[in-house]
Design a protein with these regions (language model features):
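Nucleotidyltransferase catalytic core that binds NTPs
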Residues: 1-194
């Protein structure tokens, strides 16, 4: 089971590509939009209801992908460490993998990765959890920087970010090439990130 957590603020085509690719590696991909985070003010830019609607529009019909909106429904933020226990309880016979970007593990050899330095119980997770590391084009992670139990997920031509999409919307520019049609229609109808 792959846990694909993130703010998905908004969910872009790059997120959908990652989820689709993960279905080739894992039996089930669970998209987990995070709740409000004290360390990420951009998550507060739109309501939880809008984020939930967009995540369901983006991932709802994807084969092998399910959306878990626990954090959004409960108005909480569940740390990765706690997600492990939550999903291990839901799927006691499954091996749980956490999806992260290569930038998050960079510096791992020297214990300087974001997981080591910023995540709750990061050094422990680094040694004990399974990580599926998504490699963006042009961004290579040295083998020594990878977590103890990890698997690389290589994606060619993966471009886009939530920040970029939000900035385009703020500037009144088109996001047609960065989000799926359903999400784009929702963004425009609701006039989000303007």
């Amino acid at each position: 089971v792959a846990i694909f957590g993130g703010s998905f603020n908004p969910p872009g085509l790059h997120h959908q590509r990652i989820a689709a690719e993960l279905t080739r590696y894992f039996d089930r991909v669970i998209v987990v939009p995070c709740g409000l985070r004290p360390d990420k003010a951009s998550v507060d830019e739109v309501t939880i209801e809008h984020r939930k609607a967009m995540v369901n529009l983006a991932f709802g019909g994807m084969s092998g992908v399910v959306v878990d909106t626990h954090d959004l429904d409960q108005g909480v933020y569940t740390r990765t460490y706690d997600l492990q226990a939550m999903f291990q309880d839901k799927f006691p016979n499954a091996v749980i993998w956490h999806v992260v970007g290569g930038d998050i593990v960079s510096g791992g050899r020297a214990e300087l990765s974001e997981i080591h330095t910023r995540w709750y119980r990061g050094p422990e997770m680094w040694q004990e959890f399974n990580f599926a590391v998504v490699m963006r084009p042009g961004y290579q992670v040295e083998a020594g920087d990878m977590p103890a139990c990890s698997q690389s997920v290589e994606l060619d031509h993966l471009f886009g970010s939530g920040t970029m999409i939000r900035n385009l919307l703020k500037e009144g520019q088109s996001v047609t090439e960065w989000v799926c049609p359903k999400v784009e229609a929702y963004l425009l109808e609701q006039q989000l990130y303007r």
